[in-house]
Swiss-Prot record:
Belongs to the bacterial ribosomal protein bL20 family. InterPro entries: Ribosomal_bL20, RIBOSOMAL_L20_CS, Ribosomal_protein_bL20_C. Keywords: Ribonucleoprotein, Ribosomal protein, RNA-binding, rRNA-binding. NCBIfam families: rplT_bact. It comes from Prosthecochloris aestuarii (strain DSM 271 / SK 413). It comes from the Bacteria. One of its GO terms (biological process) is ribosomal large subunit assembly. GO terms for cellular component: ribonucleoprotein complex; ribosome. Coiled coil: none annotated. Binds directly to 23S ribosomal RNA and is necessary for the in vitro assembly process of the 50S ribosomal subunit. It is not involved in the protein synthesizing functions of that subunit. CDD domains: Ribosomal_L20 (cd07026). One of its GO terms (molecular function) is structural constituent of ribosome. This is Large ribosomal subunit protein bL20.
Length: 115
């Protein structure tokens, strides 16, 4: 009985890794073993950074809200406390967008919350 080498599956596996490594510098994009390590590491970074992205954007929204709140004579923490007490439910993403795109509307929100 002839030896079975499973060439189709192994070639597909190698091709999948090298396609993911396309565009990598030097041997990282051409040599299978090096490319495999590079792709594995890239996928680890991608997995981690999909989670870090959420934290980063929340921090950015808070910075923008704080800057706009200080232009209106209050701080981020005092503004959020006042909004919670008045049951003004606007999430940070939307509030940051309003602060950047429509400062007069943001001023009205601050005035409503602080009164």
């Amino acid at each position: 009985m002839p030896r079975s080498k499973n060439a189709v599956a192994s070639r597909a596996r190698k091709k999948r890794i090298l396609n993911k490594a396309k565009g990598y510098w030097g041997s990282r994009g051409t040599i299978l073993t090096v490319a495999k390590h590079a792709v594995d590491k890239a996928e680890q970074y991608a997995y981690r950074d999909r989670r870090v992205k959420k934290r980063t954007f929340r921090a950015l929204w808070i910075m923008r809200i704080n800057a706009a709140a200080r232009l209106n004579g209050t701080s981020y923490s005092r503004l959020m406390e006042a909004m919670h007490k008045k049951n003004i439910d606007i999430n940070r993403k939307a509030l940051a967008e309003i602060a950047v795109k429509d400062p007069s509307a943001f001023s009205q929100i601050v005035k409503t919350a602080m009164d």
